[in-house]
A protein has these predicted regions:
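Small-residue (G/A/S/T)-rich helix-start motifs and N-terminal tracts that mark the onset
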Residues: 1-77
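Conserved beta-alpha-beta core of the PfkB/ribokinase-like small-molecule kinase fold
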Residues: 80, 85-132
């Protein structure tokens, strides 16, 4: 990874169909010659038909993943995707400030391509207050 000039950390959910989420982010980074690291916020069971199940990761493991990557590998930028709820949004905001991240790309994933909700309704304002 040291031969990569740019490193990007994606903080997002996993899409088992690989059409979105961390899987799509990492494929995009690789295609652009950028080293991609990831923090998993949620695991989804989804395919081209829709989302069958969503499990939000515990905040402690999200916190640990962020610290693990940023304290060692580092990141030229952080991209967020599916953050799922207000608590995760607040945690990610806190960690971005704590690690003094200068380049932030916010993709407020709210709904899947098939129309399934991927963000709790009350969390929309958390994006505005805490992350954007």
């Amino acid at each position: 990874m040291e031969h990569f000039k740019n490193k990007v950390l994606t903080i997002a959910g996993s899409d088992s169909g690989a059409g979105a989420g961390i899987q799509a982010d990492l494929k995009t980074f690789a295609a652009l010659g950028v080293y991609g690291a990831s923090v998993l916020t949620a695991v989804t069971a989804q395919n081209s038909i829709g989302v069958q199940d969503v499990r939000i990761m515990d905040e402690d493991i999200i916190n640990s993943q962020i610290d693990s990557v940023l304290s060692d590998i580092g990141a030229s930028a952080v991209k967020t995707g599916m953050l799922a709820n207000s608590n995760v949004i607040k945690l990610v905001s806190k960690k971005i400030k704590e690690h003094k991240i200068q380049n932030l790309i916010v993709d407020p994933v709210m709904v899947s391509e098939s129309g399934d909700a991927l963000l709790e309704e009350e969390a929309v304002m958390s994006y505005v207050r805490d992350l954007i």
